[in-house]
């Protein structure tokens, strides 16, 4: 039995998220069906980060086991031929049998993309959040300082979150402006359900001047979801990277745009 790693890109608009669901199409279901056909056996995959409905990925990492004798090209080109246009395998490699894309991961990186312009863009409308009011990046980055380190993020988890603990360790949280785009890059060991989108919703209030940077600290310490702002929309969020002890994968979405 061999263990294979796949680097996946997908556009999440047409899916209920990564995880297989009985009532709606999922990225996992589409991938497993295509892999199973190439392998001529049932294939189940594990992913580094389960994205929600409408969320995208430029570098999702999955692994699966198979005893099917197939060249690496079959796992990429063959499977890609069976996948829909909004899901594609970028790379494939054989890895140690102990490798697990979820549990071996050290940290994960997400980008949230904001199109900050007076006029909306027909081209980017489905790829990023449009905000027509000017955002104060400096204040947003001041607020981000309060998010670093291992903390209780109860104020930024959804009511449906099933995690056993609200504690997460954030190593990086930063807004970067590139032209009309503003990119929120966040790196952490793991994230709670809707955590990043809830953070973005609150940080936008700071950027628009409705709250001070220190307000984020107050919300964090409250450990109460009702004290934070509304959840930012899903279509601006991208899973862009994973770091493992021996290698890492990262494809920042803004570098694909610009």
Swiss-Prot record:
Per UniProt, what is one GO molecular function of this protein? Answer: tRNA pseudouridine(38-40) synthase activity
Reaction(s) this enzyme catalyzes, per UniProt: uridine(38/39/40) in tRNA = pseudouridine(38/39/40) in tRNA
User: Which keywords belong to this entry?
Assistant: Isomerase, tRNA processing
- The source's domain of life comes to Bacteria
Q: Name one Pfam family in it.
A: PseudoU_synth_1
Signal sequence span is none
Which EC numbers does the record give? Answer: 5.4.99.12
Functional description taken from the UniProt entry: Formation of pseudouridine at positions 38, 39 and 40 in the anticodon stem and loop of transfer RNAs.
**Similarity annotation:** Belongs to the tRNA pseudouridine synthase TruA family.
Q: What is this protein called?
A: tRNA pseudouridine synthase A
